[in-house]
Design a protein with these regions (language model features):
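Bacterial N-terminal signal peptides that target proteins for export
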Residues: 1-8
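Bacterial N-terminal signal peptides
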Residues: 8-16
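Non-catalytic cap/lid and distal C-terminal segments of serine-dependent acyl enzymes
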Residues: 20-330
Length: 330
């Protein structure tokens, strides 16, 4: 546990240089809940010029920290988000990060802790009642790093009716569909007591599968159509999390589900690559919130498509309409 807290500190330090001169507001509150033990320390960021009475609600970005981290991680993340806003990568947004320990943001099998329920019920309710943020799916976004990448991906995959998009960075997931197939490479950093405290003792393999993003995507891909999905991992990840990320990417690709995937050359699990990668993730959110209207229908694109469609006709290949929610597979 102490070692993982040290790694979380490294992540925070990597983001700290941007934290100086924060123009928005960052506060810490405690949210009471019966779903988890005690109250939850939570960091909330509002952007420069935040107007609680603005006619248009602000997008809400839920951020989930990594294992060993806490809401203190928001210090650096808020500054990097503010940089993304100032660069025009993403609209001015409100963001929130709860402290969740090493819970995996899971509803525990034995019912003693319900972190997923806390996020979907208590956290969302707190933000929507107390801040001028989106109260519907559109404009409600979720992201996270490492354990938070796993949590954000799982929660969004299980509840695509709640979230417009998810940006999962180096998610702590394994490249398997069944628990019994997990290899030592993908679990050396998770001890059995931790897994059993969350998934049951012994681990309830069906419960694990029901909460595994890869299995969810494989078994029910149609539920993900229309969900903005962004996946990121460094190819030098010390926890080998790029293998699990690539696995989910391949499932989504083979199922024809539109998504964006980045395997970042030379990037590690922690360190200076996190800032530019987080900015890329926020740029993805920006494109989801304000889709470019000419990427598929600009005049030059239409002209080129007309020519290519003629090639298809001559070859007897079917011509299907463009659907940005799906990969062009046929």
């Amino acid at each position: 546990m102490k070692d993982l807290r040290f790694l979380a500190l490294i992540c925070i330090t990597a983001l700290m240089p941007a934290a100086y001169g924060l123009e928005g507001k960052l506060i810490h509150v405690s949210i009471a809940s019966t779903n988890v033990p005690g109250s939850v320390d939570t960091a909330i960021y509002t952007p420069p010029g935040y107007d609680p009475n603005r006619a248009e609600a602000y997008p809400l970005i839920i951020q989930l920290h990594g294992g060993g981290g806490s809401s203190a991680n928001m210090t650096g993340m808020a500054a990097t988000l503010e940089s993304a806003i100032q660069q025009g990568l993403v609209p001015a947004s409100v963001s929130v990060m709860p402290s969740a320990g090493r819970s995996f943001y899971m509803d525990y099998r034995d019912g003693t802790q319900k972190w997923e329920t806390f996020i979907l019920a208590d956290l969302l309710s707190h933000m929507r009642s107390g801040y001028n943020v989106s109260k519907v799916r559109e404009g409600t976004l979720i992201t996270g790093i490492s354990m938070g990448g796993m949590g954000s991906l799982r929660i969004a995959f299980k509840h695509p009716e709640t979230f417009q998009a998810v940006a999962s960075m180096e998610p702590g997931i394994e490249p398997v569909l069944q628990y019994k197939d997990i290899q030592l490479r993908d679990r050396f950093w998770r001890d059995d007591p931790l897994m059993e405290s969350i998934y049951g003792k012994p681990v309830d393999e069906a419960y694990w599968a029901a909460n595994n993003p890869a299995t969810i995507a494989n078994d029910n891909p149609e539920s993900l159509v229309g969900l903005g999905i962004y996946l990121d991992a460094g190819d030098q990840d010390m926890f080998f999390l790029h293998h699990g990320t690539e696995f989910v990417h391949r499932i989504l690709f083979d199922q024809g589900i539109s998504h964006e995937y980045r395997l970042v050359r030379g990037a590690e699990h922690v360190g200076p690559s996190i800032v530019p990668r987080f900015l890329d993730a926020m740029a993805f959110f920006g494109r989801v919130l304000n889709p470019p209207d000419n990427w598929t229908n600009a005049p030059a694109v239409e002209q080129s498509r007309t020519l290519v469609d003629n090639f298809k006709r001559r070859a007897g290949y079917p011509i299907n309409p463009v659907d940005p929610r799906r990969l062009r597979t046929e």
